[in-house]
Regions:
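Charge-rich, low-complexity alpha-helical coiled-coil segments
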Residues: 2-32
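Pocket-edge positions in alpha/beta enzyme catalytic cores
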Residues: 5, 98-101, 201
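A non-catalytic, amphipathic alpha-helix used as a structural packing/dimerization or gating element
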Residues: 8, 12-15, 105-108, 177, ...
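Terminal non-globular linear segments
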Residues: 29-47
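Conserved N-terminal subdomain of the carbohydrate kinase-like
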Residues: 44-153, 157-165
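Conserved phosphate/ATP/ADP-binding segment of small-molecule kinases
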Residues: 166-229
């Protein structure tokens, strides 16, 4: 049965996607009221292009985070709505970098989006600069998420058996809470072990990996994709 685990998870995702598309088509068939004079209200700003809110940092050097996410998702036809967590001169794997914390600005952006009545089809989270930011994102998802909206979490914590600079054990704890809300998570091998409270192993068998994926999936996310394996 373990051999079919990933296939079953993919089938579950496809079923969810089909139901979502059916719901969208049904809504499009509903009669609409006569068009009103355009105005800059939340209702007017809504459109049929699927919106993805990307919660990530902006790094000046190193083509990562929002610098990579925005062009890729835009080329796929999505409207990418950045919720920046920090502005860095370079990503944290460089020996030196500046760091501008945007925690307070995140709150203001979310409050403004709520006033605008903005709807997001997908929530994608990446680098979070502090445990407090993880809590803000969790509250944001719980408040804005619709029944058919998707949550994708890239649990950025570390690599090669170690946490990234600036990432603490408290952050690991908050990330464990955040993945409970996710439909899909994409941890690398290091992050997989941290989320499971298991000692890091550089080499892992297929059977061990499948068991780890299943254990993590049982904690919330329907689909767990292990990267860097």
């Amino acid at each position: 049965m373990a051999d079919n685990y990933i296939e079953r998870q993919y089938e579950a995702y496809q079923a969810r996607k089909a139901a979502w598309e059916k719901e969208r088509k049904y809504k499009k068939k509903k009669p609409t009221a006569p068009a009103e004079t355009p105005h800059r209200s939340g209702a007017f700003l809504q459109n049929q292009v699927k919106k993805v809110v990307a919660v990530h940092d902006l790094s000046g050097v190193g083509h990562v985070s929002l610098m990579a996410v925005i062009p890729v998702l835009s080329s796929m036809g999505f409207q990418v709505c950045p919720l920046p967590t920090a502005v860095l001169s370079a990503h944290t794997q460089y020996p030196t970098y500046s760091f501008l914390d945007l925690t307070d600005e995140m709150k203001r952006i979310i409050e403004n989006w709520e006033k605008m009545n903005v709807h997001f089809d997908t929530f994608y989270t990446g680098y979070l600069g502090s445990p407090q930011q993880a809590q803000i994102v969790e509250e944001f998802i719980l408040k804005f998420r619709g029944e058919n909206d998707m949550v994708v979490v890239d649990p950025v914590l570390g690599d090669n058996g170690h946490l990234y600079k600036g990432i603490t054990e408290e952050m690991v704890t908050e990330m464990k809470k955040l993945i409970h809300l996710a439909d899909v998570i994409t941890p690398n091998l290091t992050e997989l072990y941290y989320l499971l409270d298991m000692p890091y192993q550089e080499h892992i068998t297929d059977a061990e990996l499948k068991q780890a994926l299943k254990t993590l999936s049982d904690r919330g996310p329907a689909i767990v994709i292990a990267t860097s394996v």
